[in-house]
Amino acid sequence: MSAAATADTTSPHIPVLLPAILDAVAPVQGVWLDGTFGAGGYTRGLLEAGADRVIAVDRDPLAFEMAADWAGSYGTRLVQQPGVFSEMDTYAVALDGVVLDLGVSSMQLDLAERGFSFMRDGPLDMRMSQEGPSAADIVNEASAETLANILFQYGEERASRRIAKAILTERALAPITTTLHLAGIIERCLPRAKPGQSHPATRSFQALRIAVNDEYGELYQGLMAAERALKPGGQLAVVTFHSVEDRMVKRFLTARAGAGGNANRFAPEVQRDAPAFTLRSRKAIVADDAEVAANPRARSAKLRIAVRTQAPAGVIDAKSVGMPVVKVGN
């Protein structure tokens, strides 16, 4: 039986802030690229709103398996493109819009065998593309220092060193190969969660998932790829779910819109590229109370939108956008 056949379809992935995106970028027309196809919520929303064509990109083969029942109804208006959004400018250029949802799809969380969830017992995997080193490889092979850095830099876990030490102690007895095994180790290192608080393993699982899939590197490269792929007047909409992602997106768009200013007013004026984007708003768009009530996942979501100018695409270094970098290895 395929993974698509075993996925839980009773609790479908609800696209966060979709009405806000469609309202902000209206009228929806031309060719759009959905860089995080997932369960297809944004793609379908764009097509129903009037996009001539949507190029749907995802590195997870399961995404396209799950879409088999409905994708054909859109005919040639829906183009399924296996791959990563950091390479979007090799799939298409002169795009009218790009949308990125940086959250994990519920279809991935719902499948225990994918190893993303600390609430379901399964192999400690977390690979979106199902290729390359898994979370188990990192947990069982990385040094204590590397593990602590991953947990702190990628998950903002303040107990990172305590957890890393506990992982090394546990793996000396037996390999850590399942999600619940790892979650139990982390739980023993932290106070019990109070009502309304997130599970103690939330930050650590987030950090490992980011490391396994190089999510920050993908985001950094993807933002520059979007700048190259969008035509003048094309719109970029990015939905983030935690502070590091949002900081990276905000700094990128602010810098590429020429709105950063000099850090020191006494420093000499720095020669800047012509602005490649204009910001739709200085502040991020967040979900209203009604959406949060209907979809609790929307509580932490932030949407930022910018419009491409006619200026040539440029380059910005990773440090300037605040991208954390941890060398994953012993």
From Swiss-Prot:
- EC supergroup of this enzyme: transferase
The alphabetical list of record keywords is: Cytoplasm, Methyltransferase, rRNA processing, S-adenosyl-L-methionine, Transferase
**GO MF annotation list:** rRNA (cytosine-N4-)-methyltransferase activity
Which GO biological process entries does UniProt record here? rRNA base methylation
User: What's the EC number here?
Assistant: 2.1.1.199
Q: Which Gene3D superfamilies is this protein grouped with?
A: Putative methyltransferase TM0872, insert domain, Vaccinia Virus protein VP39
Reactions catalysed, semicolon-separated, are: cytidine(1402) in 16S rRNA + S-adenosyl-L-methionine = N(4)-methylcytidine(1402) in 16S rRNA + S-adenosyl-L-homocysteine + H(+)
Q: Which GO terms describe its cellular component?
A: cytoplasm
Specify which residues bind S-adenosyl-L-methionine according to the UniProt entry for this protein: 40-42, 58, 85, 101, 108
Q: Entry's InterPro entries?
A: RsmH, SAM-dep_MeTrfase_MraW_recog, SAM-dependent_MTases_sf
The record, for PANTHER family, names: 12S RRNA N4-METHYLCYTIDINE METHYLTRANSFERASE (PTHR11265:SF0), S-ADENOSYL-METHYLTRANSFERASE MRAW (PTHR11265)
Its biological purpose is as follows: Specifically methylates the N4 position of cytidine in position 1402 (C1402) of 16S rRNA.
Please state which protein family the record places this protein in. Answer: Belongs to the methyltransferase superfamily. RsmH family.
This one is known as Ribosomal RNA small subunit methyltransferase H
Which organism is this entry from?
Roseobacter denitrificans (strain ATCC 33942 / OCh 114) (Erythrobacter sp. (strain OCh 114))
